[in-house]
């Protein structure tokens, strides 16, 4: 099922969509309106289906979008929200990356791909690939992973990464 809700933060609308069964299978969001959210939903649906996670597009009201929003604004700690995630379709390596990132890199801070890779005894490229395939943005804070030389990319848009870091009060990585 899918639950969609619109919130406002820092004077901007944010649309949050959550795929779920008993737990969250995937999260996506848009700062560019409902139409763009539909594109993001289709991308997430494709990612989940490639991972053999069945997706039901029937809309059903749930608390999950509000939980994601509460993580975004800091009312719920990221690591406390991990319990809501199903991790269905996520590889054991990706799960480890997501858990380490979420537990070790707190709100208001960033880590480089290389630093996170060192913590996991892997390569920065492997960490980057896991971040690119993260089905749980905001809860698993892939926006907190940056290049040594600057902000780096972000799916769906680099501007979204900047916005998320600004919300968290991160200085120096958002310009």
From Swiss-Prot:
Gene3D superfamilies: Methylated DNA-protein cysteine methyltransferase domain, Winged helix-like DNA-binding domain superfamily/Winged helix DNA-binding domain. GO terms for cellular component: cytoplasm. It is an enzyme of class 2 (transferase). It is found in: Cytoplasm. Keywords: Cytoplasm, DNA damage, DNA repair, Methyltransferase, Transferase. It catalyses: a 6-O-methyl-2'-deoxyguanosine in DNA + L-cysteinyl-[protein] = S-methyl-L-cysteinyl-[protein] + a 2'-deoxyguanosine in DNA; a 4-O-methyl-thymidine in DNA + L-cysteinyl-[protein] = a thymidine in DNA + S-methyl-L-cysteinyl-[protein]. Involved in the cellular defense against the biological effects of O6-methylguanine (O6-MeG) and O4-methylthymine (O4-MeT) in DNA. Repairs the methylated nucleobase in DNA by stoichiometrically transferring the methyl group to a cysteine residue in the enzyme. This is a suicide reaction: the enzyme is irreversibly inactivated. Belongs to the MGMT family. This enzyme catalyzes only one turnover and therefore is not strictly catalytic. According to one definition, an enzyme is a biocatalyst that acts repeatedly and over many reaction cycles. This is Methylated-DNA--protein-cysteine methyltransferase. The lineage of its organism: Archaea, Methanobacteriati, Methanobacteriota, Thermococci, Thermococcales. The gene is ogt.
């Amino acid at each position: 099922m899918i639950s969609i809700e619109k919130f406002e933060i820092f004077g901007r609308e944010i649309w949050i969509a959550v795929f779920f069964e008993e737990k969250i299978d995937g999260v996506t969001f848009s700062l560019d309106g409902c139409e763009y959210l539909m594109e993001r939903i289709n991308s997430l649906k494709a990612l989940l289906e490639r991972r053999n996670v069945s997706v039901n597009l029937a809309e059903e009201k749930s608390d999950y979008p509000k939980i994601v929003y509460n993580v975004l604004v800091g009312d719920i700690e990221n690591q406390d929200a991990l319990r809501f995630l199903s991790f269905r379709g996520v590889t054991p390596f990706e799960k480890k990356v997501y858990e380490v990132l979420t537990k070790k890199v707190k709100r208001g801070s960033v880590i480089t791909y290389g630093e996170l890779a060192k913590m996991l005894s892997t390569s920065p490229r492997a960490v980057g690939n896991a971040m690119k395939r993260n089905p749980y943005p905001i809860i698993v804070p892939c926006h907190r992973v940056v290049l040594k030389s600057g902000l780096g990319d972000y799916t769906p848009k680099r501007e979204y990464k900047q916005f998320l870091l600004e919300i968290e009060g991160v200085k120096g990585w958002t310009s």
